């Protein structure tokens, strides 16, 4: 059987402007993206009446987890900078809407509110100026 696998090349991560009719700007030079890591919390509801002594659980709340990604860090770029971009949002503790656009998956778009919780530059002598970023999802994501 032939594979139906798709390349993830061309996926975009976008940052919302917070406007009423929100506009999303593509975050410049995003490299690898990992996440979102969705999870369901559970509660153990095992009782003395549980069948054959097996643990019983119920689902409680859902969590959006986080999204981590690498960028070719461009400090003056509006989506990266300390005056208007990701670094400013982290320092200001600003919750923003983000979009993860996966064109290879029939244009799947995840939209989610998140906080920038990590911004770690890497400045190698023999290498490109990069940064690792982590977003913590702070509400319900939507899929379209």
Predicted features along the sequence, with ranges:
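Short, low-complexity, polar/charged sequence segments that are solvent-exposed and flexible
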Residues: 87-94, 117-121, 133-136
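Absolute protein N-terminus
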Residues: 1-2, 144
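Short, structured coil/loop segments at alpha-helix boundaries
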Residues: 52, 76-81
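Short, cysteine-centered beta-strand-loop-beta hairpins and adjacent loop/turn segments enriched
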Residues: 75-78, 141-144
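Short, acidic/charged, Gly/Pro-enriched secondary-structure junctions
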Residues: 79-113
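Solvent-exposed edge beta-strands and adjacent loop segments
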Residues: 2-73, 113-128, 134
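Short, loop-centered acidic/histidine patches that primarily coordinate divalent metals
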Residues: 72-74, 103, 138
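Short solvent-exposed strand/turn elements
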Residues: 129-143
């Amino acid at each position: 059987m032939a594979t139906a696998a798709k390349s993830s090349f061309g996926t975009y991560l976008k940052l919302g402007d917070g406007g009423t009719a929100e506009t999303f700007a593509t975050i410049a030079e995003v490299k690898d993206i990992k996440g979102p890591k969705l999870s369901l919390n559970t509660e153990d509801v095992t009782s003395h009446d549980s069948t054959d002594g097996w643990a019983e659980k119920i689902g409680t709340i859902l969590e959006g987890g986080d999204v981590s990604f690498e960028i070719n860090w461009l400090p003056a770029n509006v989506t990266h900078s300390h005056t208007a971009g990701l670094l400013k949002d982290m320092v200001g503790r600003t919750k923003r809407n983000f979009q993860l656009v996966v064109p290879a998956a029939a244009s799947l778009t995840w939209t989610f509110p998140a906080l920038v919780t990590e911004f770690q530059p890497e400045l190698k002598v023999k290498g490109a100026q990069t940064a690792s970023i982590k977003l913590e999802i702070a509400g319900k994501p939507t899929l379209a």
